[in-house]
Amino acid sequence: MSYTPSSNDLIAISPMLILCGVALLSLVVQFLIPEEDEGKPLWVLSILGILVAMYALYHTTNSPGYGKFFGSQISISPLTVWLSAIYLIAGLITLLVAPPFLSQHKTLFPEFFPLMLFCLSGMMFLTSGYDLIVIFVGLEILSLSLYVMIGMARTSVSALESAMKYFLLGTFSSGFMLLGIAFLYGGSGTTNLDGALRGLSLKGYEANFSKLGLGLFFVGVSFKAALVPFHSWTPDVYEGAQTPITGFMASAGKASALGLVIILFNHIPMGEMGNVWKYLMGTIALISMTWGNIVALKQDNLKRMLAYSSISHAGYIVAGIACGAGLEALYYLFSYSLLNLAAFAIISYLEQGKHEVTVNGISHLSGEHPFTALALSLVFLSFAGFPPLIGFWTKLFLLQKMAESDLFFHRVLLFGAVANSCIAFYYYMKITIQSYMKQETGVVAGARDLPSLPTLGFLIFLLCVFFTAGWIFFQPGSLL
């Protein structure tokens, strides 16, 4: 059956088309620029592409508006628009932070820029897709781009090892997802998201196929979200990849996987089977947040600490989703992505191409580099949920939503989230204590301080965010 796209169909996916078009243009332009430019024209072109895609994304909310497009293959909703905004903001910040670091390591290859744009378009297709095939294709575009970006540091053994490990395990998880799609199609007769999951409410072999299919599909999604027990790749890949790439993975990459979890939960039929899946994912979330925090306590390398911390944060978000959080989980994703980008940007600055940033290595950082110490401490205090920083508001609203339910299991998840927040507070505070209260000078004290003007701008931005956070969430309609 042939299908001719309408103008509204094309406008609905215009942000993705712009990103892909600029990426293809970049592949051509790289052969026309002199080698000594180190990709500066590509850098400018990529930033312009993301800014135009942001405008197109905003325009889609007015014309053609929210709805289904391409014969219900694509869905544009407030949730997908906000998720896409998170990806584009994360990509823009990464493009601003990464080039100096990559140049220092002699790994700023021209292909980095189109790969970033392809990766962003894959993320947007992943969460805007209303068909399991579209979702899978978006996931593969995202994954293949990340595999190559991680492995671009060809002289780094750890980066190549990380890329290979992520590629092999990612391919394995993609196989589970594809097999899950096959079973969902076998149980429902359609790959349309709503119809495929409706097979769970049927009787007989169709329901069994659908249950098995959804389970296999969730295995792949849990791998991308780094939920226990599919998390083993996270610390090694985060540590081995170049720091700006790690920050992008931990922000936009994590947001895309968890955004897909939100979408899937919105489409699982209500009733007994829906409750079973909520109990299952809630249990995985509880184990993830506990395991991530306990192992993070023992880490000295900041990148590995943030890797295990990301496992626990994924647990918080999925626990909230299992308790019915929608807006709250979205806001958590937004703030968590910003904090991750800030944390890895500061770490990349401290590394200076030669240092491995450890907890002991930042001793007395405030005495040598006060602006850097202040920025680093604010970010980690916000991770810990220290009031009134942005991290405090995100956890407060998520925990409030979890506390609204009287179900015993939801109370268990609430208690687990609060207890784990207390555990996490210890190792986040350790960063501030080490940088302000230790007299011995650490290894990274020889690094340059962050420029005062950008640092002050970053702090003002944080202040604006946490002061407006409460207003935003007490008027949820302002978001969706």
Swiss-Prot record:
Domain of life: Bacteria
Record-linked Pfam families: Proton_antipo_M
Topology of the protein relative to the lipid bilayer: Multi-pass membrane protein
Key words of the record: Cell inner membrane, Cell membrane, Membrane, NAD, Quinone, Translocase, Transmembrane, Transmembrane helix, Transport, Ubiquinone
Transmembrane segments: 13-33, 41-61, 81-101, 107-127, 132-152, 167-187, 212-232, 245-265, 276-296, 314-334, 373-393, 413-433, 454-474
GO MF term set: NADH dehydrogenase (ubiquinone) activity; NADH:ubiquinone reductase (non-electrogenic) activity; quinone binding
Keyword Transmembrane appears in the UniProt entry: yes
Protein location: Cell inner membrane
Record-level GO cellular component terms: plasma membrane
Keyword ATP-binding applies: no
Annotated InterPro entries: NADH-Q_OxRdtase_suN/2 (IPR010096), ND/Mrp_TM (IPR001750)
This enzyme's EC code(s): 7.1.1.-
Enzyme class (EC, first level): translocase
Family: Belongs to the complex I subunit 2 family.
Described purpose of this protein according to its UniProt entry: NDH-1 shuttles electrons from NADH, via FMN and iron-sulfur (Fe-S) centers, to quinones in the respiratory chain. The immediate electron acceptor for the enzyme in this species is believed to be ubiquinone. Couples the redox reaction to proton translocation (for every two electrons transferred, four hydrogen ions are translocated across the cytoplasmic membrane), and thus conserves the redox energy in a proton gradient.
Subunit text: NDH-1 is composed of 14 different subunits. Subunits NuoA, H, J, K, L, M, N constitute the membrane sector of the complex.
NCBIfam families, A to Z: NDH_I_N
UniProt protein name: NADH-quinone oxidoreductase subunit N
